[in-house]
Structures are given as C-alpha cells and as structure tokens.
C-alpha cells in the first residue's frame, strides 16, 4: 500500500538554517530559552499544573505558568505514572536502515522523492512500513541516553551520495500485562550495540538469507559502499527478535515486486533503528490532558511519529493557547 503524502525536501543544512531563524526570532521577541537544563518535575496543586521544577545547581528552581507544555522523550512516561496522567501503553517501532544504489530507487525517487509504503507480511501481519527515505543521502549514527547507539539517515540539499537509504520499521503493540514498550526496544538496541562493540552493525541482505555474517573484507568488495564508514560488519540477526527480523525480510521481498532490485544480495541493512513514541497520553481536541493546564506534544505524547507531524502539532498547540489568551 502506497500512502499519498506530498512533501517538499528541505535538506539537513537548510533545516538547520530554518531552526536557527526560528530561535533568533523567539529570542528577539523576549522568549527566554534554557539549554542544558534538566527539568526535574512538574508543579501540581489542587487546581492543576502550575509550573515546573528546574535543576539549578544543587537546588530546584520553580518556574510558574498558567499553561505547561511538555514535548520530551521517555521522561514523560515516568511523569504519567507518578502523577496519574491518563495514558495507555504506546507503540514502538523496531527495524533497520536499508541502503541501496540510487539507480535501484531511481523511478520512485523521481516521482515521489519519499515513498511511504505499508505492508502486513504473513504470518503475523504486523504493520511494517518504510520511513525517512533519503535519495542520495547518508546513513548516520545517533546516541541516546546511556550511550545507546541507533542508526538513522539524512540527506543534504546540495551534497549527494550514490546511495538511497530508508528505514523499514515493524510496529510493536504490546498487550497486558506488559507495559514497558520503550524498555523492550532499548534492550534490543543494547544487545545489538554489545555485538557491535558500541557501533552500528551492518549486514548484506544476501548474507542474511544465506545464514551467515558479513565480513569487513566482503563489505569492502561490495557494489554498495556504506555511507556510514564506521559501521561494523556482522550479524544483525543475532540481536534482532525473530518476529521483527522475519517481518523485515518478508517486507523486503514484497518491496522487490514494486521496486525490482531492492532485494538484491548487496543491499545493506544497518541495525538498530528504533523509534520511541512513549505512551499515548489521553487528550481532547484542545490538547488538554486530564490535569488542568498541562499539555503534551510530539512523539513523546504518543500522537505523532516524525518531525513533520510533531511540528504541525506544535503549531496547533500555539494556536490553541493564543485563542485562550484572546489573540
């Protein structure tokens, strides 16, 4: 299934310029921004949320506000449990970053730039999708808390590589009694990092089908040259859960029917690619939680998946707050 989603490509370097322009605009209009500052907790009173507590050296600095908006990572999950913020366990996506030659994806890249494809491979029929496609892009490493290394991808507006990369993600929706989806995905990532000595692991698709690891010498002789130069050749299947790995393999076979050559032996799979969406916070159409004055945004709220939709949610929140102020 192809999801129709028209986009305009901004590029990593252009995005940085845009974010800086936004930051400068806020600063010029009197908005105080604090970086490298830890928010310890929220301030709750009988009437609702009244502010936040920031770490200020060895003490806590209270910052009061009529409206508090949270757009964080798994810290919000802890807040939900501590303060009884209405929520339900969210989805986590576990998968790989796939890299192939540009000519394999040439027709798709020219027509769509980023194709969003969804499938439900047998036997489990879990939702598997493509995400964050980067024609002429580069595979990159991100580092999360506790030195968790995960793979990602990006592309520049001007500088291009000979490869296209994209994520293939398997959605995991857990049921009772399990309620720690983020911790589950983190463990998968930690195990992969252990096998790769702290580095991202990469394996050729053909080697996976042959039941063998990829060696550095083989990778160096491959037609597809990895754009993440310090990725370690190895066996990603030793850490990837069987169900997720099977879904990924079957989905690649399905994609090969649409994009011939995608399932080539030389296609590279990097691991781990993890997307943490936190628990889904219950909110109404005004983005109000069950606690008065408290709102949640972006992927941490469990309502969006990706930068674009998280940004749109931020614009919506701004408009709602402006309406309350009569602006």
Task: State where each predicted segment sits.
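Residues forming the flavin
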Residues: 1-327
């Amino acid at each position: 299934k192809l999801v129709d989603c028209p986009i305009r490509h901004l590029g990593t370097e252009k995005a940085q310029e845009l974010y800086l322009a936004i930051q400068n605009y806020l600063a010029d209009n009197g908005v105080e921004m604090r970086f490298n500052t830890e928010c310890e907790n929220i301030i709750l009173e009988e009437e609702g949320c009244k502010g936040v507590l920031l770490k200020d050296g060895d003490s806590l600095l209270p910052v009061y506000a009529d409206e508090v908006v949270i757009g964080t990572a798994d810290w919000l999950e802890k807040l939900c449990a501590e303060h009884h913020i209405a929520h339900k366990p969210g989805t986590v996506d576990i998968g790989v970053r796939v890299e192939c030659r540009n000519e394999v994806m040439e027709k798709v890249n020219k027509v769509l730039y980023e194709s969003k494809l969804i499938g439900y491979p047998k036997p489990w029929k879990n939702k598997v999708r493509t995400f964050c496609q980067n024609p002429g892009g580069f595979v990159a490493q991100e580092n999360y808390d506790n030195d968790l290394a995960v793979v990602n991808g990006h592309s520049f507006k001007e500088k291009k590589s000979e490869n296209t990369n994209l994520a293939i993600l398997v959605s995991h929706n857990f049921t009772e009694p399990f309620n720690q989806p983020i911790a589950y995905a983190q463990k998968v990532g930690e195990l992969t990092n252990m096998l790769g000595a702290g580095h991202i692991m990469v394996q050729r698709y053909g080697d996976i089908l042959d039941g063998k690891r990829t060696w550095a010498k083989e990778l160096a002789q491959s037609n597809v040259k990895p754009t993440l130069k310090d990725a370690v050749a190895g066996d990603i299947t030793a850490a990837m859960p069987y169900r997720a790995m099977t879904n990924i393999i079957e989905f690649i076979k399905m994609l090969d029917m649409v994009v011939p050559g995608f399932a080539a032996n030389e296609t590279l799979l990097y691991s781990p690619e993890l997307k943490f969406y936190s628990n889904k916070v219950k909110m109404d159409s005004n983005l109000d939680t069950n606690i008065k004055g408290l709102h949640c945004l972006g992927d941490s709220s469990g309502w969006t998946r990706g930068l674009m939709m998280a940004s749109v949610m931020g614009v919506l929140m701004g408009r709602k707050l402006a309406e309350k102020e009569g602006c």
